[in-house]
Amino acid sequence: SISGRSLAARLADPYARARDYSETQIRTAQQLALQELPAGWTLDWQITDWTVPARTFRYTGLTPLESIKRVVKAAGGWLYADRFAQTLHAVPKWPQKPWAWDFVPDMSLPSSYALKETRQAQLGTAYDAIMVCGGINNGLAVLVTRAGQPGSDPAASVTDSLITDLEPAKARAVQELADGWPLRQYSISLPLQAPPAGAGLIMPGTTLDFVDGADGWRGLVVGTSVSVSSTDVTQDLEIISP
């Protein structure tokens, strides 16, 4: 068998050294992430940015990749490595809210492409609010409520010292509420073929319509793996849908 890792492995153990660090200057979140990258690397920042006070960003025993993930997670983001370049992409973990699942998807996937499809339910709770706190040094505490809801059924509160502004608090609230939402989980296997014969490689973060007549549905790809045999190349997708 053949296995591999992305270029971002160079920013993680055992290739990159873990260190202890405390930022003594005021920085934006994006600046904190950028300064962790060695020369030759770039950062595609697609999440909210905000100001972080001095001595708020501190850590012990983290590699560059781990420390950047720490910053991105504060605002409900997800970090992934580019397939070809020395680039990290910071994007919202949930590009669409599961309680507002009305959007134009990135692509359509005909059911005829699927070799196998399985489905299971993920239990969850449709909470309508969550308290997001910035830690004892920042004094930020915000009750974020879903639009049009009373906020009478909140999820367990979350605390993150890097949440020092309202915008990351709101973004983190979306991620926390969405992670606990009642969902359906689909596993789909299909041949890896370039269009128009197939769908091409479908990456995590892609939104799609699974076209199957009255049984079709709309989902978000959260995992992709590729397997190779002597005769076939197959991609296996993990997809979630409210």
Predicted regions and their residues:
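A residue-level signal for beta-strand positions that form part of recognition/binding surfaces
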Residues: 1, 87, 129, 218, ...
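Short, solvent-exposed secondary-structure boundary/capping segments
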Residues: 1-6, 226-241
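Charged- and aromatic-enriched interaction segments used to assemble
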Residues: 3-122
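Solvent-exposed, flexible loop/coil residues
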Residues: 15, 131, 237
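Acidic, small/polar-enriched beta strand-loop surface segments
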Residues: 69, 73, 79, 92-231, ...
